[in-house]
Regions:
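C-terminal motif of bacterial Sec signal peptides marking the signal peptidase cleavage site
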Residues: 27-31
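Extracytoplasmic substrate-binding proteins
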Residues: 76, 176-243, 339-356
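Alpha-helical, coiled-coil/dimerization segments enriched in small aliphatic residues
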Residues: 125-130, 249-278
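Extracytoplasmic ligand-binding site segments that recognize negatively charged/polar headgroups
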Residues: 126-128, 168-172, 188-199, 203, ...
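Proline-aspartate-enriched helix->loop->beta-strand connector
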Residues: 157-163, 182, 290-293
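Structured C-terminal subdomain patch of bacterial secreted/periplasmic proteins
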Residues: 291-356
């Protein structure tokens, strides 16, 4: 009897255990279904965010995509190759993650974005001297005899080439370079440094860095403009460039001329009121209406012409000379193209004119 009871007891235990297992299995299956639905919904939301990033640069919840890339639910990068059109109309496939960029004469802007090129522009053995500390270890490519051959460029293994002027792309060079790596061409990057920095930042996934750099420069220029205005007023400022081939008065549309006359709002001579530059000679010099003059000995190669002009009685009789308001500009960066150079120029102008 006791044995039969024990057998019955064990039988009930087996039945109860089986029932419990069924309940547990059903619960687990239900939970897994909920988890799958939840993960699918989360994946859909993340996919929507990534699409928003690719098309607008921002995610749907209002958070900015700093480098115009997204992340999936595992936190890995979702960068993808994209196609853009350069300023000459070429369709250019930009790599998902640019590692090795070659952008001769745009080293200033590259460094401002925190990017080192695989090689740098040089005239003979001299690159942009004011950038050499930051470009330490970056090989020089001599452009004095023309652009580097495709074979020479291939040795640096660039995955993106950026040409700062359309003249660099002429005579079949673009077609040759484009076979090495995707090649983006500006019409004239130096003509609008702010615009070209913005584009370069976008190409390299550094859009937010470019935006911050531009805001910082605008703030610096605005503060300098206020200081200069109280001293200079409506007087004119001139930039005279001495070079082996001649002497010229720089206008306000590019390089240091843009900084002085556009960013700092300083008046310019009527000789360059509508021109990018004007030739200067001893005969024309008396027409120069400027109370402040900055002198540039271009790459230290205009010494002979500088001496010829500045030792003449006509020069010595000019108001700016008599008043001690002629300043020698640093030719390393006054002919530079980029915010690093522009910031240095702003500092020079404020220090020279205001003494601050």
């Amino acid at each position: 009897m006791a044995e039969r009871f024990n057998r019955g007891k064990r039988s009930w235990r087996i039945k109860i255990s089986a029932l419990a297992c069924c309940v547990i299995v059903i619960g687990l299956l239900s939970g897994c279904g909920d988890k799958v639905d939840s993960e699918a919904a989360g994946g859909d939301q993340q996919a929507a965010k990534n699409v928003a990033i690719e098309t607008t640069g921002t995610v749907e919840d209002g958070q900015e995509s700093t480098e115009e890339t997204g992340t999936n639910s595992e936190g890995t990068s979702t960068k993808e190759e994209r196609t853009v059109t350069d300023e000459l109309g070429h369709e250019v496939k930009i790599p998902a993650d640019v590692k090795n960029v070659f952008a001769p004469n745009m080293e200033d802007s590259l460094l401002k974005l925190g990017v080192k090129p695989v090689a740098q522009w040089a005239n003979g053995k001299m690159g942009h001297t004011y950038l050499q500390q930051e470009l330490d270890g970056v090989p020089l490519i001599d452009f004095s005899g023309g652009l580097p051959s495709p074979e020479a460029l291939m040795s640096f293994e660039p995955d993106l080439i950026v040409l700062h002027t359309e003249t660099y792309a002429a005579d079949g060079t673009y077609e040759k370079y484009a076979k090495i790596a995707p090649t983006y061409v500006f019409k004239n990057a130096s003509g609008n440094v702010e615009k070209s920095l913005t584009i370069l930042g976008d190409l390299l996934g550094k859009a937010s860095v470019a935006e911050t750099a531009l805001k910082d420069y605008e703030q610096k220029a605005s503060e300098a403009k206020a200081k200069l205005s109280s001293v200079v007023g409506d007087k004119n400022v001139a930039i005279i460039r001495f070079a082996p081939r001649g002497v010229s008065l720089m206008g306000g549309n590019y390089l240091c001329g843009f900084v002085l006359h556009q960013d700092l709002g300083l008046g310019k001579s009527k000789l360059v009121e509508k021109e990018n530059a004007a030739n200067i000679s001893l005969e024309i010099l008396p027409q120069l209406d400027a109370d402040y003059i900055f002198v540039i000995n271009a790459y230290d190669q205009g010494t002979e012409r500088l001496k010829e002009i500045t030792e003449s009685p006509i020069w010595k009789g000019m108001p700016a000379v008599k008043n001690g308001q002629v300043y020698e500009a640093n030719n390393e960066y006054w002919l530079g193209s980029g915010l690093i150079a522009y910031e240095k120029i702003v500092d020079d102008v404020v220090r020279s004119i205001t003494g601050q």
